[in-house]
Amino acid sequence: MKQLFSLLCFLLAATGIWADGHGPVFGLATPTNSKGEWSFDTGLFGRANDLGSEASLRALVGYGFTPHVSLFLTAPAVIGDLRLSPTRIQSGSDFEATVKWRFQHRATKVGTRIESTLFAGVAAPGPQSGFDDLVVTHAPGTMFGAVTGMASRSHYLWLGATFTKFYEHSGSKRPDVLDYSLVYGYRPARWRRSADRWDWRVFAELVGEHSDRFLETGSPVPQTQAHQLFLGPSLLGIYRNYTISFGAQASIYQGLGSLYPKERVRFAANFSYLLFQHSH
C-alpha cells in the first residue's frame, strides 16, 4: 500500500504526463474530441481489498475526426497481482480501441446543452490479466455502450452504460461485463475562471459493474460471478490545454462469488494535454 501511495504522489507531482480531461474519472460522459484535436493521456486506477492494493497505469491517445466522432487507443500496465473481480472501468488490464459518436448535441438555452454519445470498441486482455487457478483465455471482446445527459455552466448530469462481450477460445472464456454509471457535477460560480487560471468542478459518481462467470473447459466456474456498486467524489481542474482529475469511491453494495475477496476502495488520478483544441 505504501508503494502505491508513493507512486500516486509521484504522478501528482510530475509534469508532461496526461490523462482523460473531458469529464469524471470513474463514470461515463458525453464529450468527444473536437475536429483535429489530439488528446494525450496518462491515468492511474487503483483497487483495494482486504489483501492489499492493485493499480493499473494507462496511456491513452485520442483524435477527433469531426466535432462529434473520435477514436481512442488505450494501453495499460498493472502493478500488483490481487484476485479481483473483472472490471472495465478505465480498461483495467485490457488494451482497447474505441470510437465515440456524439449523435445528439442540442442547445436548449444559452450555456446549456443536451448531448448523447454512442461507444463501440474492441478490448484485448493484456498479459497481466490472468487469474490464479483458472485457465484464462486472452481472446478479445467487443464493447458497445451509450451515455446521455445535460451540461450547463453550473451543472452536469450523465447516465450511461457499456456492455463488453468476450469470446470463447478452446473452451475458456472471460466473463462478459456490464458497467453503468450516474454522474452529477457542480461548478460553483466562485470556481469559474478564465482560460489562464485553474477552473474547477466537483462530481458525485455512482458506478456499478455486473459480470457473469468464467468459462473453463466449456463449463461455468462456480462462484466467479460479481455485481458491485461504488460511490464517491471526484474533482476536475482545467488550465488552458491541461487538465487534472482525481477521486475515490467506496463500496456500497457487493454481490460477489466466494472466489473474490471483498473490494473496499477504488481511487483514480488522470492527467491530460489537449493539442489543437477547439470548442465542442
Go through each PLM region and give its residues.
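Residues that define the transmembrane beta-barrel architecture of outer-membrane proteins
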Residues: 53-57, 90-95, 114, 136-142, ...
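Outer membrane beta-barrel transmembrane domains
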Residues: 182-280
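Transmembrane beta-strands of outer-membrane beta-barrel pores
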Residues: 44-48, 75-81, 103, 122-126, ...
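Residues on the lipid-exposed face of transmembrane beta-strands in outer-membrane beta-barrel proteins
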Residues: 40, 59-63, 73, 97-103, ...
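Solvent-exposed loop/turn segments connecting transmembrane beta-strands
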Residues: 20, 47-55, 79-90, 169-175, ...
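Short loop/turn motifs that connect adjacent beta-strands in outer-membrane beta-barrel proteins
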Residues: 29-36, 51, 68, 104-115, ...
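Outer-membrane pore/translocation modules
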Residues: 79-175, 271-280
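Transmembrane beta-strands of outer-membrane beta-barrel proteins
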Residues: 38-42, 71-73, 97, 112-120, ...
